[in-house]
Amino acid sequence: MSQTATVKPQSPWSPLKITTFRYLWLAVLVSNIGSWMHEAGAGWLMTTLTTSPVLVALMQTATSLPAFFILLPSGALSDILDRRKYLMAGNIGMCIAAVIIGVMTLSGLITAWSLLGLTLLLGIGMAMIMPTWQSIIPEVVPRTELQAAIGLNTLGMNVSRVIGSLLAGTIIAASGSGAVFICNALSFIFIISVLATWKRVPPVTQLPPERFFDAVKTGLRFTWHSPALQAAIFRSIGFYFFASVMWALLPLIAKDLLQGGPLTYTFLFAAISIGAIGSALLLPKFRTYLNNDQLITVAALVFAVALSITALVHINVVAMLALCFCGAAWIIVMTSAQLAAQTALPNWVRARGIAIFQMFFMGSLAIGPVIWGSIAEITSLPTAMLVACGGLVMASIFTQRWKISGNDNLDHTPSQHWLLPQPKLFIGAQQGPVLITVRYEVAKPDLEDFLREIKLLGSGRQRDGATFWQIFEDATNPGSYMETYVVATWLDHLRQHERISKQDALIQQRIRVLLQPGTVPLVSHFVHPLVL
């Protein structure tokens, strides 16, 4: 049953009523326009600096490759440091790189290799801040506006791509690529100014920040033990791995299937963008009838049918109309999957979780095109498109086992109900490992319910930092259970007290109800001695 059947549709523009989000959204829009202008200008300039196809192709690699290596570390830094200051530093660095590219180009000092290297720096800067931009959205909009806010972000991305490409072409024709690079540098000024005036309220904590490598491991551990985040990742992979065939083969669709030229390619690209923009505006209306799981499934089927029509009917108007539906489906899945990832993550690990989600997303877009291009080369272009569409249909059915609609109901707000332990020993912050045991006396009729709830609690312990968790039954006293878990240091255990959510607190309440009357959980802490 659809959980959204009686929900009143939100206005897609409602998050813009929130002043902080409005200014951040406009600033990101302007910055993205500048980034798309740089991509167009740099690509054109490289063709005038070298005749090497490899160097020209490496421009795209320089923009996207850093994400594979930097997303997770940058997510860890974003969760450790102040996100506002981190974003400011990243944008200032990219602004400086853009100024250098512009000045070198205008002065005639730019070379193919220097352009490639400086573009790589911009790519690194973008990868450094990508998870942070996504992770601050829930900080500036209420949960009820999160879907619309993510939709506006995807809308802004597509609008900036169209505007940036058009402006770049006009400016290159009038003044050359150097002027485009200067415009890109200027686009950072607005976003830096907005960040400088944003009065962000950092999360309240009495503990020092995590160490970098520990933060990375914690992010990976959280993902491993978070079915909600895994569901968002699997649904995303199930769509984008196969749907990437559209972007991979779009130039060949224009040239070979439709027997067109650059203008045909431009029209096809515009059709995809129009569909994407339209669906972003209509998505709140769609959500009144379908939940996120249903939206992704329907969008995948629409994409498969529309792209199959493009592969079989080689008529320009038909192809543009079909690709318009493909663009709409693409954005529906992107917005729904991103919302599922956002709602699966508490604030303390949000940037790391978003970074891991984006790594799988970008990995699908990187690996998929290689496969579809190879199939097209071995067989034919329509065959590759139809194989991908068939795979997409099967994947949309197979991945339905991972439900994401329930993520909307998760409450990651810190419960603050768990009192800090009061040890009689002196325990250093980095002393460990630490073993925690909790004894439960369970009534026999409630045993099955207890084991189900304790397993859920164990997943929460591991998401919050436990490196080991297990439940044991006393062989000499049936019904007496010992929960044991290990954390690396005493400080990590104190962080667990800060991180435990209202969702996990409800699980603990349900467990208490299942215990024998007159008993309560008995907690003990054991720490590795400083000297052996």
Language model features with spans:
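C-terminal transmembrane bundle of multi-pass solute transporters/carriers
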Residues: M59, F69, P73, I80, ...
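Juxtamembrane intracellular "pre-TM" segments in multi-pass secondary transporters
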Residues: S2-F21, R200-F234
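Helix-loop junctions on the cytosolic side of multi-pass membrane transporters
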Residues: S135, E139, F181-R211, Y289, ...
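Transmembrane alpha-helix termini and helix-breaking/packing motifs in multi-pass membrane transporters
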Residues: G43-T50, G102-S107, I163-C183, L252, ...
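Substrate-agnostic recognition of the 12-TM MFS/MFS-like secondary transporter fold
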Residues: T20-A40, A62-S78, D82-A97, S114-A173, ...
